[in-house]
């Protein structure tokens, strides 16, 4: 298969190495303390997540839920009560980070959200979406609701929009 070589074969003249597909990395800052940012991000994701167009159920999607424990589900709920799983929490370390499988791609990828205190009332929220090397070129173009998928930057733009929505929601809950 193009881009692959047999196990133990060393790269040499004429060999083809697999393309490296870099992770998507986005970050933002929130004017609030670490605990508030993490808790509000997780517990109100169903309020601020941009379900249109970033959901499995489209117009049927009503909310998003994160089960707050290792092994917990991240899922959306539709207007008829049906749930569609986005992934499972592989790491749960409040208030610093969580890592989840991402099942909304043809082959699972992984998303890490990290929360870092930059000061008493300033927190950085960073996302790294990785594992793109598991997808074919066609899957990379067709893997998300936005036209072009990974290959055209749709996921990068989607994560930027999600982070911006989270900042607005979190900062609106400040006293």
Predicted regions located by residue number:
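Hydrophobic ligand-binding cavity/cleft-lining segments
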Residues: 2-61
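Intrinsic-disorder/low-complexity, polar/charged segments enriched in Ser/Thr/Lys/Arg/Asp/Glu/Gln
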Residues: 23-29, 73, 84, 97, ...
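Hydrophobic/aromatic beta-strand elements that line small-molecule binding cavities or substrate pockets
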Residues: 26-28, 64, 87-90, 110-117
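A short, structured loop/turn motif at beta-sheet edges
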Residues: 31-35, 90-95, 114-124
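Hydrophobic pocket/interface hotspot
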Residues: 37-41, 74, 89, 100, ...
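Short beta-edge strand/loop motif at the mouth of beta-sheet-based domains
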Residues: 43-86, 95
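Short, highly charged C-terminal tails/helix-capping segments
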Residues: 58, 62, 164-175
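Beta-strand/loop substructures that line and gate deep hydrophobic ligand-binding cavities in soluble
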Residues: 103-157
């Amino acid at each position: 298969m193009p881009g692959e070589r047999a196990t133990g074969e060393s790269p040499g003249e004429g060999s083809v190495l697999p393309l490296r597909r870099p992770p998507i990395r986005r970050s933002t800052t929130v004017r609030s303390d670490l605990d508030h940012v993490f808790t509000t991000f997780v517990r109100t994701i169903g309020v601020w997540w941009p379900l249109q167009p970033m959901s499995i159920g489209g117009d049927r999607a009503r909310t998003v839920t994160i089960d707050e424990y290792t092994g917990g589900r991240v899922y959306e709920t539709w207007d008829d009560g049906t749930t569609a799983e986005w992934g499972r929490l592989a790491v749960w370390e409040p208030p610093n980070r969580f890592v989840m499988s991402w099942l909304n791609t043809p082959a699972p990828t992984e998303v890490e959200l990290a929360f870092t205190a930059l000061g008493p009332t300033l927190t950085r929220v960073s996302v790294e979406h990785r594992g793109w090397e598991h997808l074919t070129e066609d899957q990379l173009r067709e893997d998300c609701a936005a036209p072009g998928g990974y290959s055209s930057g749709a996921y990068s733009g989607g994560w930027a929009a999600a982070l911006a929505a989270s900042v607005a929601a979190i900062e609106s809950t400040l006293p």
